[in-house]
Amino acid sequence: TQPGATRCAVLASSTRGAFSPSESAMVTASRAVPGIEVKSVAAERRKDPEARRAVMAEVDVVVLCLPDDAAREAVTIADSLGEKAPRVLDASTAHRVAPGWVFGFPELTAGQPAAIRAARKVSNPGCYPSGGIALVRPLVDAGFIAKDYPLVVHAVSGYSGGGKSMIEAFENGTAPHFEVYGLRLEHKHVPELQLYGGVTRRPIFVPSVGNYRQGMIVNVPLHLDTLSG
């Protein structure tokens, strides 16, 4: 234990994937960031609500690396702790457009870094929206595109973001080299793109996956003759 350190818990639903909250990982993280003491729930109890409650009651900040429903449950537990409730950083989609949450995108506006620092609850931006918002919001704020502009956001991602089954399909050669998905135009990132992009019209979002493990390309085509300024 580091005297005076900020105590941080990481809650994950799996010990596999992009983040594995093993004991060695916790020790490495604590040593890598002076002043931060990282805690987690033992792997065999990682889905136990009481174990999650116990660790959240001991820390200053909790990072949620959970599916949406599990993240909502974890926030309910945190809220029930009253004065012992930690600050929450949620990496899921569950709270990105929810009232009472601050969007963790410091470049969004001049006041966003201060809002994040002061917030008790911060929602981590999604991967696709980070690219889309970074492209669109400055143009909206500067008045170059109207808030009701009919935006189309195209994005290509590597396959590692699709989870275990997608990774296996691409790496064993059974997946197509390129695949468009979300063709019902109801992708879970659309509300986030619209709200923090600063637009009033629902964007058309066209996500796709390419045959490469990591990386992302996001583009937003615009008609030059419709731009202001």
List the model feature ranges, each with a label.
Residues 1, 6-8, 13-30:
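Low-acidity, Ser/Thr- and Arg-rich intrinsically disordered low-complexity segments
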Residues 16-18, 29-183:
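N-terminal Rossmann-like NAD(P) cofactor-binding subdomain of oxidoreductases
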Residues 7-10, 119, 173-174, 200:
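General secondary-structure edge motif
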Residues 62, 162-229:
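Charged docking surfaces used in two-component/phosphorelay signaling
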Residues 3-4, 22, 35, 50, ...:
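Generic low-complexity segments that are intrinsically disordered, proline-rich and/or Lys/Arg-biased
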Residues 25, 51, 73, 188, ...:
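Short Gly/charged-rich anion-binding patches and loops
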